[in-house]
Amino acid sequence: MIIDITEIMDLIPHRYPFLLVDRVLEIDLNKSIKGIKNVTVNEPQFTGHFPARPVMPGVLMVEAMAQLAAILVAKSLGSTKNKEVFLMAIENAKFRRIVQPGDTMYIHATIDQQRANVWKFSSTVTVEGEMAAESKFTAMIKDKS
């Protein structure tokens, strides 16, 4: 099931310049999701990170992983219109390859555990078949107040 940017914006609240998932390529409800982020030089982080050699910040790669996981949660629950997804913890984040404008980040997130409103994930980012980043993280789903 491919999910385009319009549906992504219906599923998660993030918007430019902080929407970091361009398309979902594959989803297996309650299990895993694959998506992409096309990295372009026009993104605001590259004006300062770094002007002479733009490099995608590692923290934004982790954020892209978390946003993709939030899409998986929304689709698995049927809707998150009355809910909010909050990142609680990031564990074992590792960055193995520079990501720069012109690259396509292939993001994969897998649910490791889900108990009540707490979800644990493992996620990776690859570029041109090479591991660029990996992380484990925990998110909490809460009712909107």
From Swiss-Prot:
One BP term from GO: lipid A biosynthetic process
UniProt keyword Nucleus present: no
Active site (UniProt): 49
Pfam families documented for this protein: FabA (PF07977)
Location(s) in or outside the cell: Cytoplasm
Record's catalysed reaction(s): a (3R)-hydroxyacyl-[ACP] = a (2E)-enoyl-[ACP] + H2O
SUPFAM superfamilies: Thioesterase/thiol ester dehydrase-isomerase
GO molecular function annotations of the record: (3R)-hydroxyacyl-[acyl-carrier-protein] dehydratase activity
Keywords recorded for this protein, A-Z: Cytoplasm, Lipid A biosynthesis, Lipid biosynthesis, Lipid metabolism, Lyase
Annotated GO CC locations: cytoplasm; membrane
EC number assigned by the record: 4.2.1.59
Enzyme class: lyase
Classification via PANTHER family: 3-HYDROXYACYL-[ACYL-CARRIER-PROTEIN] DEHYDRATASE
NCBIfam families in the cross-refs: fabZ (TIGR01750), PRK00006.1 (NF000582)
Xref: HAMAP family: FabZ
Role noted for this protein: Involved in unsaturated fatty acids biosynthesis. Catalyzes the dehydration of short chain beta-hydroxyacyl-ACPs and long chain saturated and unsaturated beta-hydroxyacyl-ACPs.
Family: Belongs to the thioester dehydratase family. FabZ subfamily.
The protein's name: 3-hydroxyacyl-[acyl-carrier-protein] dehydratase FabZ
Organism: Rickettsia felis (strain ATCC VR-1525 / URRWXCal2)
Gene: fabZ
